[in-house]
């Protein structure tokens, strides 16, 4: 065994001072000194459990000892009588075995393949033991789940990712999918449960047993987000539901993930074979499938953007030539040819790599280089994680941990280690690029005239610019030259490395060539240079624009069309990634797909990292806003569709925020106990105003109120028990916090909850009964007007139905026409006095007479006035469809309804476009005179004369 390096020998003295007397007095072996110096995790563990060190010294870890894990664990669990005892024994067993694995790994007593096998088998042993113990306990409590024939139904667990492939790393979370075979009910229990309820409850308990931190730590962080429909899907699915999902909705990334899926525990039973046979056609196509290459290329692009987004450097997993690229290379062949070559259907990487070489799909040399690189990287990764039992793939920056890794990897020092690492990663990147890299051959650099280069390099005198700027006016020419000079001065104030300068010198002549060809060159250049100033120190973004000419062209056209987009890109340069694919840039997400897209986006973010979750929500929203605005500018989205997309996007955000807040609150307090025997959360979010009316603009805030149906006597069922209604209040406060917290990516939405009963003085969250009572007995007419444009945007079906019934009841109350007319008109006059245009000779599109608010008041008045006679008027919450209903129900002539609809959409369209230009919502007084006259006439007819 290699002696400790000089820095580690010095550190050993610090270790000695930490060791308790019994250990310090012992004559520790050289092996023990080495491992304790290398790993703080082992050090902490043996200080807490000195007997483990004695065991290690007397019974050195062996390569095949994984075969005994199940028996050892069964012995440890033999006297466990309750869930708390189960949790303690599982945690202690995991820590004890992990210390043995760390010992063997640090001292290289076994091969790296053996380490991966031991780590994976340990996880499987713990998962299966916990499942089996809980299954027996749940059967005693609720009866045994059976199918229609009375046959007991098991819970099958799919281990995904590295767990499934038998290649788990030292400190890893585990990705699981739960399934049960057939529908039915429990038998032999105190009361009957259907199988879905049984397995959902059992699954929740299993996750808690493995995942919940206690004084003994946790067993594994459990991630269930790879299951069908992710967090919004059922925790456990029947085989039939799984099959339907993967046949009808399975995505490429799910197919990719399923390659490594492995059934935990007994994998040869009837049900296990049935599940495997069901999934195989989804994963391995019967034909040779070259579409996989583009899918994996896209996924690699996503990972590269993720590396940029999270600022990852020195990452041996996700970086260029890292572990992920080796996995991609192997899985390309599995997914392309696995259906035709059963030998490629292995879950484990190294055996599959051998098959790939044997089939001559890769050269023997390339396959061997990948094998050696993989084992090198996995050993480095596992050693890195075993220092502190910490889930990281980022190389350390401190001298101690660098010295530790260099010693354990058998190098003299850190530079030698990084030199070898670079060589391995370079080999991997070469093979990856040959196989999966962009298939478009690099286009030859456009031959730019020397004048564009000179213009950028400030080598052209003003008189020399005439040939390249001839089409511009003299003032514009001067402005362009000033902008370039100012930009160069700004660069001199910033720290830009040689690579950044090189990229800029390549990019700027191309950019100037494209921008200066435009008539609006000066305006466009001013917007783009403002953006570039923000990203010049981040070379990856400059490279993106330099290497992808199409992205540069999209940037120029969008910045020319909209200063709002230019500002967004300058503020959040991560959005530049969106410019790479025009198919998605000018094609917003389908309105019904925002939730699913957001779910997939959030899969890439650790579930327990609130800061990253908040950033991801904001980044997703900004990317989607960019796409909507791009489609709006391109003319592919009419005004109604723009608002539809903005509204669906907001609803997806609300859904995700409520989900996050709910998970956080339940983790802290447990669930309100009135939910124990029912589906759902007993909670609803009601959207008012533009959100309720499907009429959101680019910068609209959200008018929300929160409802619950929690009884007065309900309590939560967690360790920190609180009153059920207090739980919902804290849930609503948490939701507001998640929306309003300002991160580096800004806030998510401004949320206004003042439309709740009693306004700002009222409770933030209201019971459904109290809301109904308030609307019937206390609400003002303007609050009933607001109810016209209200609808549930998140909530349980029963609460949604309750709200809809209350809304319908309030809106169909008989009202005295003149009184209502007076109250609505007076409220409008108050608003006009307060909000009307303060700009002389300007027309405020929303607030002034003849504007949008007048149309909204007309529709609200007519619904409240006539819904008692025509209840169908309550169906919709948006103005356009309300106007249709008014015509269909003979309240308003069709010609007038259509004219008001045209005026309304025209004015809203103008507001959207003013927002894109970052202009206020008022225009010259001589604009929209026809529309305003029409609205005034309608106002006079309904709210003055009638």
From Swiss-Prot:
Provenance organism: Shigella boydii serotype 18 (strain CDC 3083-94 / BS512)
Keyword terms of this UniProt record: ATP-binding, Magnesium, Multifunctional enzyme, Nucleotide-binding, Nucleotidyltransferase, Transferase
Signal sequence coordinates: none
Name of the protein this chain belongs to: Bifunctional glutamine synthetase adenylyltransferase/adenylyl-removing enzyme
General function of this protein: Involved in the regulation of glutamine synthetase GlnA, a key enzyme in the process to assimilate ammonia. When cellular nitrogen levels are high, the C-terminal adenylyl transferase (AT) inactivates GlnA by covalent transfer of an adenylyl group from ATP to specific tyrosine residue of GlnA, thus reducing its activity. Conversely, when nitrogen levels are low, the N-terminal adenylyl removase (AR) activates GlnA by removing the adenylyl group by phosphorolysis, increasing its activity.
Sequence similarity: Belongs to the GlnE family.
EC number, UniProt record: 2.7.7.89, 2.7.7.42
Catalyses which reaction(s): [glutamine synthetase]-O(4)-(5'-adenylyl)-L-tyrosine + phosphate = [glutamine synthetase]-L-tyrosine + ADP; [glutamine synthetase]-L-tyrosine + ATP = [glutamine synthetase]-O(4)-(5'-adenylyl)-L-tyrosine + diphosphate
Keyword Transport (UniProt): no
Co-factor requirement: Mg(2+)
Adenylyl removase: region residues: 1-440
Span list, region Adenylyl transferase: 449-946
GO biological process entries: regulation of glutamine family amino acid metabolic process
SUPFAM superfamilies linked: Nucleotidyltransferase (SSF81301), Nucleotidyltransferase substrate binding subunit/domain (SSF81593)
Lineage: Bacteria, Pseudomonadati, Pseudomonadota, Gammaproteobacteria, Enterobacterales
One of the record's GO cellular component terms: cytosol
Gene Ontology molecular function: [glutamate-ammonia-ligase] adenylyltransferase activity; [glutamine synthetase]-adenylyl-L-tyrosine phosphorylase activity; ATP binding; magnesium ion binding
Alphabetical list of InterPro entries matching this protein: GlnE, GlnE_rpt_dom, NT_sf, PII_UdlTrfase/GS_AdlTrfase
Enzyme class: transferase
CDD domains xrefs: NT_GlnE_GlnD_like
